[in-house]
Amino acid sequence: MDTSGGNLDSLDDTEPLPELSFEDFLEPTSEKSSQHMEIEALDSEEDNIGGEDLADPANDSLNTPQFKKNVVHILEDKRLNSSGLTVLKSHAIKMVTAGGTPPAKAQVTDVKILNKLKPIPSSTLKIGSTTIATKSTPGSITKTLGNLTQIRTKDGQVIFVQKSVPGTQSSTAVTGSPSGGIRRLVAPSGIQKAVLSKGVTMASTGLVKAAVPAKASTSVPGSAITLKGIQPLAGGTAKASTSSTTATTSPSLAQPNKIQVVRTADGKIIKINQAGPSLLVNAKQGTGTTVTPGGSAATSVKLSPSTGNVVLNKPVGQVVVRTETPVKTATGSVASASATPGKMLVQSGGKQILVSNKNIIKLSPNASATSSTTHTTGGQTPSTSSGLHAIQLPGKGGIQYVRVLNNNKSAAGTSATASIPKTVQTQKITVVRPPAATGVPATSTTTSAAAASPAAASKANLAMGNTNKIVMRSMGGSIVPLPSVQTLVSKRALGAISNASKPASAASSSATPSASQELPRKHRLTDLNVQLKQSASVSSEASDSSDAGPEAKKPRYVITMQQGSQKAASQPVQKLINRTANVQRVVSSSTSPSSNSTKKIYNYVQPTGSNGAKYMICNSGVPQSSTSAMRRGYTGYVENKTRRPPPISPQQHRFKQMGPQQQSKHQQLQAQAKQRIRQQQLPTEQSTPIKVEPKLPTLPPGVKANVPAKPLFEVLKPPATAAAAGAVDPLGGMTSRRKHCNCSKSQCLKLYCDCFANGEFCQDCTCKDCFNNLDYEVERERAIRSCLDRNPSAFKPKITAPNSGDMRLHNKGCNCKRSGCLKNYCECYEAKIPCSSICKCVGCRNMEDRPDVDMDSLDGLMGVEGQKKDKAKNKQLNENRANIYFTDDVIEATIMCMISRIVMHEKQNVAVEDMEREVMEEMGESLTQIIAFAKEKQETSQIDESKPSS
């Protein structure tokens, strides 16, 4: 998969972004101070002397098509009493929430710089009510400009920004050198910006929440939205201030409205409707560190709870920043669930991605560098990271899945625990990574997330090794799964577990494996199960409170391992036979020394209703019963055993996968089953039944049977005995020429299935849910037994030969009504035999005395029947005249003459043969007289008819 974020196209970006000029960001002031005029005059003189062609800031429009330098403009001078430096990686992540009503007129926002350092005197620049002082050397720091903030850029420039007290419009004038001019603040390419708008605050929970649709029409500052992807310097912790102060004072009538300004990658400035605090990522790396017990260095980041505006710089790891929830507000605050809906903009590699999701979208990038906090014995220096990049995949139901990855890789592997605070109860997600082959024992720090207060939940130690996979979970009615993760988790180090109350040094000192740490290792699987149950309950409660968005899904946890060098990826992985089920088991044998030669079983879960997302979870070290094998994607620990996979519907494919010895056994079992059915079909008069030997020939373990590959099914040969041959021979090859069954509801276990009735297995049939095969031998035997109980001759051949003669007859006879027994569904006609007296057919034409009609179809006889109808009409008159002469009196007189002749011969004791001859002669004489009389009558009638006609 291409994880580069540079070639991503924008999604759901249908509205064009507005372009603003520089005049839109200036405060609407009616007067211009003398200091402004003086600085502008100095700037014009300096430009003319130096030969630089710089446009006036008032006329410097950004709407021109050519690309201009990245200029940082400080718009408003409002002081925020907070200190501490935070860091952010390159490849900035821009978050923009939209969906609210656009402002009626252009509004000016205040971008506040929170980092406070000691400034130095230099030439100053005042734009609006903000004074900026620039100096190239930070050596001479004086206390005269104590109200300025120093910012150092990559190119060596030092920028001083003046800030005033929050909530006031007063500005502190800074006296600058007359020779100083206006210096353009050019942002280097490495400095990125992250702007949160529409009621967005920073939190230490490690999650990014998009605003949920609010019931109110206006958004109030203080709505909580959290961001993950930031880590403190040197693996430190981000602490929120515990003091409770008012959030933001209500603006006075003279105070102008505020807007949010975002600079895009192509140099354009975008004005965004902003009612909440903003975040500017363009600051210096923090220098102040605090020493924790055990020699671990950490950077303490303190944020003011009053506004929630933060300045971030480039980090070595992840920084978790959170502003405390305001306690007292003049304008009021709402919960995060009532924020206005919008979109989240993720920028990576110069392109923008718009994610349309009204619910929660959570990004969880892994830190690409380690810090000295976790490695207390190795003494390694923290390595720098190249930054983050984001990729986005389309999901089901309009959800866009965003995945943030880091660019570089780190060789040192650590084991850490990410704390995720909940509103109901404490949650822990354990991320497992193998220790690096550097001799440094891996450490594991478990941090609990308390739900009582945000300050208690904002402490997390997140210095982790490099992985190209991330852990995502669901909360609030939407989940962001991993796209196609197929990695295996190596076994965690023995005893690498500690409590949240222990310091980092205590957690590092407890990383040495020993025999006394077997008990914590046995309880890890139980802890994982408890975490899954808790997360499921929390996610279900959170999904109930959401107003819009896609249907909530159950959370999935993905635990992956780092992908370092090629040597680490050389562990043998063996997959079982392909299965159609949703869960696949993969057995991996680890070569690491900490595995203790025990096998680990992985579950490969692929939900069918999702968008193809795949999950894999490892269980190792703890045996489980079979009752919890398939519970939430877990399987028990089995030593040197694998479960038999379910059968595959194409049986020939399965037969090809069998070994030679299994194929021979399969064929022998099939032959026995067929022979058993044939034995039941033999006549009861057979005195010597065939014995079927249940024993199969066995071979030594080392010898393999060289059996050539045969088809899955074969036609049985007739038995050796004459009686059995007589019973099977009447089929006349019907088995080979029969048509395939097409059963859909009977599972091929009823007698109207030709395959089942003939005692054969279904082969190349179009039946559904077929049980007439060796895979369901138990069900098939049960159906055969029930049929024989009802009808002992159920499986006997329908067409048998009589004791004498060669004619074959049907045992039951056909029951045709309309076809005249000339269609193939007539069993007698299909077997090439005439219908007998047993048949109950109506209008039968399949008779022995008519060979011309026997094998012809009824359609070919339609023309013959038409000709016969014409002849029948001509003969109808003659038949009516015959009835005139053969009356009841004539027939009775003829019979009386024959009887009188018999009585006379009996009195004379004449032989029987002579008596029969005399009787027949008497009947012949009677018929001769009748015919002669009829001829006379016919001639008379013809003469009578000819006379009137003439």
Curated annotation (Swiss-Prot):
Domain CRC positions: 737-849
CC per GO annotation: chromatin; DRM complex; Myb complex; nucleus
Record's compositionally biased regions (Acidic residues): 10-26, 40-55
Region described as Disordered: spans on this chain: 1-63, 366-387, 500-523, 533-552, 638-702
Pfam families in the cross-refs: TCR
GO annotation, biological process: eggshell chorion gene amplification; negative regulation of transcription by RNA polymerase II; oogenesis; regulation of DNA-templated transcription; spermatogenesis
Keywords for this protein: Activator, Cell cycle, DNA-binding, Nucleus, Repressor, Transcription, Transcription regulation
The protein's name: Protein lin-54 homolog
Gene that produces this protein: mip120
